[in-house]
């Protein structure tokens, strides 16, 4: 393991001599507290965004967590929504104490894990795996907990790449004038699109593919997972291609309301993500490998580096403004340099 988790000392010192009556009262209070925790945890609900519904991979992973949680006397059920906003609304309205939703739309609950969706921050599944392995490190753990919400993990989905219906674009300069789908609540995406002379068009996760099919946008950033139900040539056009260059990383963040759960429950769930980090990212890699090779288009190292520099410039503006978590950005730089020392922000590349 990269780090060893630190467990706070919560031992309570009791007097050596204690009356038998006090012991009985203590035991009774302890018993009542345990039984009350068990019963109240049994009513918990996790609202989950899964485009594939109850049979989707995201729901399956959440049910794995549900079974894992039972060994800690915590029971919850998973309610899946195919429209993300419905899951978020149910969570905000108090209908559920857990939420599984995209890292793009969980920013409001946790700044650190919300930054996992940042442009140019997580370049591949290996870096995502390394992040998961660090979730219970004390320096990171304290950034995952605030008064009302706690981030307990992320299900990796994969990198978001540009999907387009033409084979005429292979350079950044050729993006000028193109209509590119962006999320309305994501200013860095909008700034990035404008920086290349393209036109940002607002979409959300539920209508982006429909907008692309109806030619309301020319370029759709998307993870391969979202494309798997489609035949790209038949459903989008004969010249459809996917640029093998990640714009951002797509993951499903798990957010809970910690007051609804026993102490240290969040840490136990993060431990599950640490233990299963390789399995989770392998699944994301399998999805990406499932897309036939002839759809992928590589760009030159020079083009990648030019684009990386442009992305970093915009990203750093949003670090200074406080939109992205500064510690998270520095952590991602270090993890990225371990994986790709040639990246221009790494010491070895200078």
Please describe what each predicted stretch is.
Residues 1-2:
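Short, small-residue-biased leader/transition segments that mark boundaries at the very start
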Residues 24-29:
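Sec-dependent signal peptide recognition
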Residues 42-72, 150-214:
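Bilobed "Venus flytrap"/periplasmic-binding protein-like clamshell domains
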Residues 43-160, 234, 239-248:
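Short, glycine-/small- and polar/acidic-enriched structural segments
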Residues 91-101, 179, 199, 214-223:
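Alpha-to-beta junction loops
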Residues 102-195, 246-349:
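Contiguous mixed-secondary-structure segments that line small-molecule binding/active-site clefts
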Residues 199, 203-238, 243-244, 249-250:
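Glycine- and acidic-residue-rich phosphate-binding/metal-coordinating active-site segment common to enzymes
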């Amino acid at each position: 393991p990269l780090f060893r988790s630190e467990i706070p000392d919560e031992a309570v010192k009791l007097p050596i001599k204690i009356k038998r009556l006090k012991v009985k009262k203590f035991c009774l209070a302890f018993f009542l507290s345990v039984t009350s925790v068990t019963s109240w945890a049994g009513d918990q609900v996790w609202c989950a965004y899964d485009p594939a519904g109850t049979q989707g991979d995201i729901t399956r992973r959440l049910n794995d967590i549900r079974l894992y949680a039972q060994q800690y006397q915590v029971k919850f059920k998973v309610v899946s929504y195919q429209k993300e906003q419905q899951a978020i609304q149910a969570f905000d309205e108090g209908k559920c104490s857990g939420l599984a939703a995209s890292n793009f739309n969980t920013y409001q609950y946790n700044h650190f894990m919300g930054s996992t969706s940042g442009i140019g921050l997580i370049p591949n599944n290996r870096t995502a795996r390394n992040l998961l392995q660090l979730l219970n490190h004390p320096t990171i753990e304290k950034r995952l907990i605030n008064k009302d919400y706690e981030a307990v993990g992320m299900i990796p989905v994969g990198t978001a790449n540009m999907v387009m219906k033409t084979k005429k674009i292979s350079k950044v300069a050729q993006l000028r004038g193109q209509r590119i789908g962006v999320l309305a609540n994501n200013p860095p995406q909008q700034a990035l699109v404008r920086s290349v002379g393209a036109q940002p068009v607002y979409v959300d996760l539920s209508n982006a593919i429909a907008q692309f099919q109806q030619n309301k946008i020319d370029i759709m950033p998307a993870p391969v997972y979202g494309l798997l139900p489609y035949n790209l040539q038949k459903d989008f056009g004969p010249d459809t291609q996917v640029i093998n260059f990640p714009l951002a990383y797509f993951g499903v963040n798990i957010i809970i309301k910690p007051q609804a759960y026993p102490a240290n429950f969040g840490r136990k769930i993060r431990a599950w993500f640490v233990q299963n980090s390789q399995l989770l990212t392998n699944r994301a890699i399998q999805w990406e490998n499932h897309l036939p090779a002839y759809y992928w288009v590589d760009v030159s190292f020079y083009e990648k580096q030019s684009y990386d520099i442009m992305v970093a410039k915009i990203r750093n503006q949003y670090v200074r403004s406080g939109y992205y978590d500064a510690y998270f950005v520095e952590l991602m730089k270090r993890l990225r340099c371990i994986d790709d020392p040639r990246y221009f922000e790494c010491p070895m590349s200078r």
